[in-house]
Structures are given as C-alpha cells and as structure tokens.
Amino acid sequence: MKADAKQITHLLKPLRLLLLGAPGSGKGTQTSRLLKQIPQLSSISSGDILRQEIKSESTLGREATTYIAQGKLLPDDLITRLITFRLSALGWLKPSAMWLLDGFPRTTAQASALDELLKQHDASLNLVVELDVPESTILERIENRYVHVPSGRVYNLQYNPPKVPGLDDITGEPLTKRLDDTAEVFKKRLEEYKKTNEPLKDYYKKSGIFGTVSGETSDIIFPKLLNLITSKFG
C-alpha cells in the first residue's frame, strides 16, 4: 500500500460522509486511510459494532448472528436503533460534527429514518460515495481476509498480511475469519446488496450529494476518493 499524501488539517465545511460499496469492496480500508488523512474526521461502522455485539453475546448480538451467518441483511428497525443510539452517545448530532458512516444506511427506509433524525439537529449527510470494485476482485479479497475483532483491523494475506501470521500487529491477539467470509455467503450477500443498493443510490442521487469512485485496488481508489472530497470541501 502506498504512503498517503500530506494530512488535510482544514476543510471549508464539516464533512458528513457515507461510504457505499458491496461486501468486501474495501470500505474499511478506505475509512482507515481517510481517518489518517483527515484527523478531525471520526467514523462509525455498523459492521464493527455488530461484530463486537456478537463477540460479547449480547441480546442484539445473538439476534444479529442468525441473519449474518445466512448472508442476510439485518431488519431495518434493528440496525437503525443501534446506529442512531450510537450517534447520539458519541455526541455527533450537531452541525459542527464531522464523521463517516460505513455500512449504514443500507435501505431507503433506513436512509429516510436517518435523514429525519439528522435534520432535527442540522447535521445532515452532505456526501455519499459508492466504491465500485469488480466482483472477481472482491471474491479474491474475502477469501484471504482475516480480522482483529476488538479493534476492527482487517488484514489480507496477499497485500496486507500481519507481521506475525495469525496475530494482530498491535496487540498480538489472534486473528479470525468472519462468519460471512465464504464464497457461498458472499454471493448471497452480494445479491441482497444489489437489491437494496440501486434504490438507495437513486435516493441519494436525487439529493445531489452522490458520487462514485472506481478501481481494483485501494491505491487506485483512495486518490480518487480524496480528490472528490477536497473538490467539494477543501
């Protein structure tokens, strides 16, 4: 992975960004790079939150496990309650807040519910970007992907391997495979994603805040993503 350019320490207005993309398209990787590049930006990942809940075997975690293991998306009410509660708990429901959402909303119903909440606090989304990656590239990625669940750090045995095989670089704790990181589950998740993503894209296109960046690797996509952000907010 190439080193990123100089940090962006100031934007002309607060950025509230939603990243869209198929499972395995690299949303987590792009999020990590954006957080390093734009220090004042914070992030919230529905996937990371859910995996933490599953690991802790909370009521929400047990309920979510049934859907995730089958490659199904979570019901709107379940994920919406979780995310909106977390946004409030983090103090991000204010006009000056800068944040990035990964993995939520996934349906127009979720998007509408989120918009209503954010409008009440004058903190609406102002940029939605889809990561467009070939399906064959994504399948190869997930077959080689391992994660450190507590932190959400993601490794790939081909292009981003851990320093010590099977262990997290920072903590030395074991890495694991996600329940949904199999070819069979991926294909189910991809079909589910396609069904909901087109209406979601149309929803955000109408608001004039939607954009797309395409590429096969993180190093190709990230400069395009950064240029899109700086052209609108820099």
UniProtKB/Swiss-Prot annotation:
Binding site for AMP: 46, 51, 72-74, 103-106, 110, 178, 189
Region of interest (LID), ranges: 144-181
Sequence positions that bind GTP: 24-29, 145, 154-155, 218
Enzyme Commission number, as recorded: 2.7.4.10
CDD domains referenced in this protein's UniProt entry, alphabetically: ADK
Region feature NMP, mapped onto this chain: 45-74
Pfam families linked to this entry: ADK, ADK_lid
Activity sensitivity to pH: Optimum pH is 8.5.
Catalytic activity reported: a ribonucleoside 5'-triphosphate + AMP = a ribonucleoside 5'-diphosphate + ADP
The protein's enzyme class: transferase
Record carries keyword Kinase: yes
Matching InterPro entries: Adenyl_kin_sub (IPR006259), Adenylat/UMP-CMP_kin (IPR000850), Adenylat_kinase_CS (IPR033690), Adenylate_kinase_lid-dom (IPR007862), ADK_active_lid_dom_sf (IPR036193), AK3/Ak4_mitochondrial (IPR028586), P-loop_NTPase (IPR027417)
GO cellular component: mitochondrial matrix
Gene Ontology MF term list: adenylate kinase activity; ATP binding; GTP binding; nucleoside triphosphate adenylate kinase activity
Compartmental location: Mitochondrion matrix
GO biological process: ADP biosynthetic process; AMP metabolic process; GTP metabolic process; ITP metabolic process
Thermal dependence of catalysis: Optimum temperature is 30 degrees Celsius. Active from 30 to 55 degrees Celsius.
Keywords of this entry: GTP-binding, Kinase, Mitochondrion, Nucleotide-binding, Transferase
Transmembrane annotation, as ranges: none
Subunit structure, interactors included: Monomer.
Miscellaneous comment: Depending on the yeast strain, the GTP:AMP phosphotransferase is encoded by ADK2 with or without a single base pair deletion/insertion near the 3' end of the open reading frame, resulting in a long or a short form. The ADK2 long form (this entry) is also referred to as AKY3, while the short form has been named PAK3. A sequence of the short form can be found in strain S288c (AC P26364). The modified C-terminus in the long form contributes to protein folding and is critical for protein stability.
Domain notes: Consists of three domains, a large central CORE domain and two small peripheral domains, NMPbind and LID, which undergo movements during catalysis. The LID domain closes over the site of phosphoryl transfer upon GTP binding. Assembling and disassembling the active center during each catalytic cycle provides an effective means to prevent GTP hydrolysis.
Family: Belongs to the adenylate kinase family. AK3 subfamily.
Function field: Involved in maintaining the homeostasis of cellular nucleotides by catalyzing the interconversion of nucleoside phosphates. Has GTP:AMP phosphotransferase and ITP:AMP phosphotransferase activities. Does not accept ATP as phosphate donor.
Name this protein carries in UniProt: GTP:AMP phosphotransferase, mitochondrial
Source organism of this protein record: Saccharomyces cerevisiae (Baker's yeast)
